[in-house]
């Protein structure tokens, strides 16, 4: 009897271990491959100059000194950051184990040479970010030499001097324009690019991009994904439909913009996630036909008064994206007063509208831009009787244009550096912005995205980036 019991216990124990082994084996068999989709467009993979959703690829392939997170930064290529009491001098001490994907060492001198190369060769608007460095803008405009620029190297430390104090300069350097570069990349095919991020390109075709782990990445041991497979699809609806068919793990920014006419459906799905970003929408006034009336500050203030960013966030984007500045839904009293004030200014200036409608421009095939623009233009037409035509035809003289910009830091006031650079203003505070209105501010965009539950470690940073190296599939 004892022998029988012993045999029974042995059999049961073996079965239990076998089941445990099966579960372990099953867990190990989970494919660490992340599937998503991006637009079918031209990709150059150049941190100095990129377009559209290309930033989503650059942040996987390249790495800067820091990564932006909800509060402050994560140190990645540096072991420490120091700054002077007045925040004008910054010292970045780099890791000693940094390498390019081809094994070549990365040092502080690599960053110094890369930043100078960007000042010499970048034709992107993003180069303005470097202009906060002492002497950088003059060097960019070929007025001085390298010795006048506030960048130098001591041992493996990158020492940066700024024109003015910037308390969050460690956030600024998380943006791609500050990434290190390899000059050879200009002559290399996309699948041969030399990179320093967690992934590198293993295959690039017209229909698919495949990324694989970079074995020379300093933190490769913590990169769980083996591959990233990105389908390239031109049509937004077709790309979106890949998610409910389980062909992809994730859909949305920063890889693909959510199609506007699918937002209603998206909001009913349990896989929906919403993340705040530092992307800001506004309406600029290029005024290419030189109508002095639209340069009148009081007119611009009235145009801003009747706008309704709250409506845009709640009804158009459907995710409560907030107004850039506190701006409640305009009441009928506010609208009526704005209308009266507008007519007084118009009459006093003896101005008559053009017989040809003024052009309000949005990008071709961008339905979200069109809806956001229309929601404001209809108020300008309704309250002020301004003849305006909303179109994506850029051949006509543009008077108004809807635009957005990704600040890439946690400080909304950093938007003013871009506004000052692009529109020639000198704004330093919210009060100055609202008193001068170089553009009509609208809202801060929140991103609505879709992710299946098997994707763990997913997070959109305030700059709208996703670092896939932190993701694993379960």
Walk through the language-model features, giving the residues of each.
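N-terminal lobe/hinge region of extracytoplasmic solute-binding protein
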Residues: 37-85, 116, 194
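Aromatic- and charge-enriched surface segment that lines or borders ligand/interaction sites
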Residues: 80-127, 293
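Detector for C-terminal structural segments
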Residues: 302-334, 368-378, 396-474
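Ligand/substrate-recognition segments at binding pockets and active sites
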Residues: 206, 345-407, 447
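A structural "hinge/loop" feature
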Residues: 38-56, 77, 104, 168-179, ...
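Ligand-site clamp/hinge motif
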Residues: 185-187, 216-261
């Amino acid at each position: 009897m004892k022998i029988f019991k012993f045999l029974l216990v042995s059999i049961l124990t073996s079965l239990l271990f076998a089941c445990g082994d099966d579960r372990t084996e099953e867990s190990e068999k989970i494919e660490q491959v992340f599937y998503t989709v991006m637009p079918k467009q031209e990709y150059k993979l150049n941190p100095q100059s990129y377009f559209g959703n290309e930033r989503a690829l650059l942040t996987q392939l390249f790495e800067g000194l820091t990564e932006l997170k909800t509060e402050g930064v994560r140190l990645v290529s540096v072991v420490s950051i120091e700054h002077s009491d007045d925040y004008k001098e910054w010292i970045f001490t780099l890791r000693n184990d940094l390498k390019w994907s081809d094994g070549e060492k990365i040092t502080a001198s690599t960053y110094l040479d890369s930043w100078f190369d960007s000042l010499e060769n970048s034709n992107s608007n993003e180069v303005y970010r470097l202009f906060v460095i002492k002497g950088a803008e003059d060097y960019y405009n070929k007025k001085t030499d390298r010795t006048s620029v506030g960048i130098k190297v001591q041992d493996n430390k990158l020492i940066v001097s700024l024109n003015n104090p910037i308390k969050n300069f460690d956030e600024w350097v998380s943006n791609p324009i500050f990434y290190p570069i390899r000059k050879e990349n200009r002559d290399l095919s996309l699948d041969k690019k030399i990179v320093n991020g967690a992934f590198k390109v293993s295959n690039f075709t017209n229909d698919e991009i495949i990324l694989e782990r970079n074995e020379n990445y300093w933190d490769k041991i913590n990169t769980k994904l083996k591959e990233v497979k990105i389908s390239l699809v031109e049509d937004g609806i077709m790309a979106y439909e890949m998610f409910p068919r389980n062909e992809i793990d994730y859909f949305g920014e920063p890889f693909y913009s959510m199609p506007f006419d699918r937002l209603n459906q998206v909001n009913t799905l349990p896989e929906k996630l919403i993340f705040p970003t530092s992307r800001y929408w506004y309406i600029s006034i290029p005024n290419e036909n030189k109508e002095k009336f639209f340069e009148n500050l009081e007119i611009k203030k009235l145009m801003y008064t009747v706008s309704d960013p709250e409506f845009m966030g709640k009804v158009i984007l459907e995710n409560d994206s907030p107004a850039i500045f506190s701006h409640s839904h305009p009441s009928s009293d506010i609208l009526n007063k704005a209308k009266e004030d507008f007519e007084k200014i118009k009459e006093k200036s003896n101005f008559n509208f053009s017989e040809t409608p003024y052009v309000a421009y949005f990008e071709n095939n961008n339905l979200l831009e069109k809806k956001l623009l229309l929601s404001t233009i209809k108020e300008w037409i309704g309250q002020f009787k301004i003849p305006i035509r909303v179109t994506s035809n850029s051949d006509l003289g543009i008077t108004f244009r809807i635009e957005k910009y990704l600040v890439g830091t946690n400080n909304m006031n950093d938007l003013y550096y871009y506004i000052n650079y692009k529109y020639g203003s000198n704004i330093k505070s919210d009060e100055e912005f609202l008193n001068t209105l170089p553009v009509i501010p609208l809202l801060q965009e929140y991103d609505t995205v879709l992710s299946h539950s098997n994707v763990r470690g997913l997070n959109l940073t305030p700059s709208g980036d996703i670092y896939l190296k932190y993701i694993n599939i379960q």
